[in-house]
Amino acid sequence: MSSCINPSTLVTSVNAFKCLPLATNKAAIRIMAKYKPVQCLISAKYDNLTVDRRSANYQPSIWDHDFLQSLNSNYTDEAYKRRAEELRGKVKIAIKDVIEPLDQLELIDNLQRLGLAHRFETEIRNILNNIYNNNKDYNWRKENLYATSLEFRLLRQHGYPVSQEVFNGFKDDQGGFICDDFKGILSLHEASYYSLEGESIMEEAWQFTSKHLKEVMISKNMEEDVFVAEQAKRALELPLHWKVPMLEARWFIHIYERREDKNHLLLELAKMEFNTLQAIYQEELKEISGWWKDTGLGEKLSFARNRLVASFLWSMGIAFEPQFAYCRRVLTISIALITVIDDIYDVYGTLDELEIFTDAVERWDINYALKHLPGYMKMCFLALYNFVNEFAYYVLKQQDFDLLLSIKNAWLGLIQAYLVEAKWYHSKYTPKLEEYLENGLVSITGPLIITISYLSGTNPIIKKELEFLESNPDIVHWSSKIFRLQDDLGTSSDEIQRGDVPKSIQCYMHETGASEEVARQHIKDMMRQMWKKVNAYTADKDSPLTGTTTEFLLNLVRMSHFMYLHGDGHGVQNQETIDVGFTLLFQPIPLEDKHMAFTASPGTKG
């Protein structure tokens, strides 16, 4: 063991802890002593050995530290904050002027898709309560498929029990749907993704609308309405229910601006909200990038992916609202660390090394880690060790809640699942699909990320809710499986090529003899059925999870759909991810020089 400390290889510096004030009570002092950061004494035990290691040849990040530190936005100025507050006040007044139920539903839909719903939660809830509790038999439930579908989708989204039988009025004597109205079909298609298991009417609605939308897209009729054409294309690619709110907002603002019935008040507020959030994200990225650079992981562990900005995109997608800054910080760093550890287990580490690393995480013993781990693993382990302890100390200080055991166990579950897959690879074992998924729902990081989201984004932490999350409830189980399957659809080809354990597609092919095309379609069908299970849970009024925690979980799954829809958006940095990262994080939406008109009601033409 070397007796000197090399400053350039410290896993984390004391500077990372300068922002932490002294503990204010005896319990906190004791905990802080337990959580103090550790410096790395590099061991040469393994470093001189020649080991044949695989390489994934990952490309470096296109967003480097210097670029992130150069970010600067005008939207942090007080003038913009005052203007945004003024606009929100005007919108609240205008919302009260919208009387007709259909106009109210369209207003809510616009608020959600423009990224403004979190600013008007009370107003939205009041409107939906009135619509749901109104015993009046609205005419649209028999005559207007668009309105009926919109009402169904919004009510189910917000947890109101609505029967699928509201659509019986739009079926013929043979039970088939009757509709030649494109707007109604599109609305029904979006509503069908809120279906539950066993709802035959909603399944028929999905089949009918999917077939019809594909036929229309093939035809040339869509040239008459570019806006509807773009909506149809995106709906077939990914429904609204599966889209990340912040990503949808950036696209919808652009589309909404082109609409003849746009409301200028909502449009300006949406642009202002997006730009001010983007300014917040940029400041957060600068701080996190400094932390990441101090660890030295990106520089020293060159075999691993350096995906800090992609990691931030995940955290922003999970918790985009301004009040979740600390949650985004913890999630971003966690996902960046997960990425490095994943590459160690998938590509770089030997099986013996991986078993020792797993043992070190289970022991959570710094002396054991320093004695037994090779140098590159010391850096990774100590970065994880110090960060988890910093996180635990921060929450203890803020809430007098010791989360160390919970977060350690969550990380250990992931590491153990990684080891299972590494053993499968080294033994050339191909599991059956169900066996693969039971381990894969953990190795995809779903349980860990939702635990981190809850612990970093909740104040106060509720012990009962945390224990429920730790029990692997159905909503975590099925959401994580969807995450796993979507990841496999986007990454399996690249991962198999560079040498990795068979993914769900290959497992199904091996188990059934199916072609890859058939296997991929089977995986897609599985995901849609799993979403029905998730929908049932979110509709459960007796759930111990808060709405915020549930939304964290749903947004994690939605982010997986985005990241892996066109390939490996996290690891390979495909063009879709690069473009979205640029528009979301670095490119503000232009505002008009003069203030826009404020007279029109948000739900109607402006």
UniProtKB/Swiss-Prot annotation:
Pfam families on file: Terpene_synth (PF01397), Terpene_synth_C (PF03936)
Co-factor requirement: Mg(2+); Mn(2+)
Gene3D superfamilies: Farnesyl Diphosphate Synthase (1.10.600.10), Terpene synthase, N-terminal domain (1.50.10.130)
Catalytic activity: (2E)-geranyl diphosphate = (4R)-limonene + diphosphate
Uppermost EC category: lyase
Superkingdom of origin: Eukaryota
Chain residues that bind substrate: D342, D346, R484, D487, K503
Binding site for Mn(2+) 1: D342, D346
GO biological process: diterpenoid biosynthetic process
Residues annotated as transit peptide in the record: 1-32
Record keywords, A-Z: Chloroplast, Lyase, Magnesium, Manganese, Metal-binding, Plastid, Transit peptide
Free-text cofactor note: Binds 3 Mg(2+) or Mn(2+) ions per subunit.
Listed EC numbers: 4.2.3.20
Gene Ontology MF, one: (R)-limonene synthase activity
Residues engaged in binding Mn(2+) 3: D487
UniProt short sequence motif DDXXD motif, positions renumbered to this chain: 342-346
Cellular location(s): Plastid, Chloroplast
CC per GO annotation: chloroplast
InterPro entries assigned to the protein according to its UniProt record, in alphabetical order: Isoprenoid_synthase_dom_sf, Terpene_cyclase-like_1_C, Terpene_cyclase_plant_C1, Terpene_synth_N, Terpene_synth_N_sf, Terpene_synthase-like, Terpene_synthase_metal-bd, Terpenoid_cyclase/PrenylTrfase
Binding site for Mn(2+) 2: D342, D346
Protein family membership: Belongs to the terpene synthase family.
Domain notes: The Asp-Asp-Xaa-Xaa-Asp/Glu (DDXXD/E) motif is important for the catalytic activity, presumably through binding to Mg(2+).
Protein name according to UniProt: (R)-limonene synthase 1, chloroplastic
Organism: Citrus limon (Lemon)
